[in-house]
Amino acid sequence: MKAVRQYGLEGVRIQNISKLAGVSPGALYRYFDSKEQLMMECFTYVDKQAAGIFDCMKFDPRNMLTDPMEAVRSLWVPYFRFWLARPDETVFYHRFRDSAFFPAYDKSRDASYFDRFVGMVQVFWEAFPNLRQINQDLLWLHVLTSTVMYAKYVVEGVLPDNQETEDTIFRFLTEGLSGYLISDKDKNRKLQSRNTE
């Protein structure tokens, strides 16, 4: 993963990987048939770690009804911070998911290790049926892939690693531009109407 971060997904060679690992290229070929197989195994390794976040998480579905945005945030923050804590894995994962062969690979792979996360999503679908109207590929590209992309920008130093960045990314992912295209006058009106309800 460190080699992909340094040389890019297409530019990395088995020789680069073996040098960083401190082994001969031949030693890698004893375990992997090709660079592509090694990349897929690395992806699966990191993907399973990301799925493990949700396996350990305490999730109370009732929170969706009382504070849906906080329920989403309680799932999103650990996922985002997972990527911030792993710079090499984050850059690798983003580049692998962004590659031309990923969509076909993604449709054919076994991702059953995400079953707990899928169960959480189904609870959201039941509470908010309008989520089913969204193209699911587009929804997950927006939420999960964009989260990894923003984390990549943070670990590469393009965005600052601070609370303001985290809050802004979450707000942008959940509200989009419409959350920012409100004048102060409209914002005050909304606040007043909420307070009178």
Locations of the language-model features?
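Alpha-helical DNA-contacting segments of helix-turn-helix folds
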Residues: M39-V46, Y93
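Amphipathic alpha-helical packing segments from all-alpha helical-bundle domains
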Residues: A51-C56, D88, F101-F128, D137-L141, ...
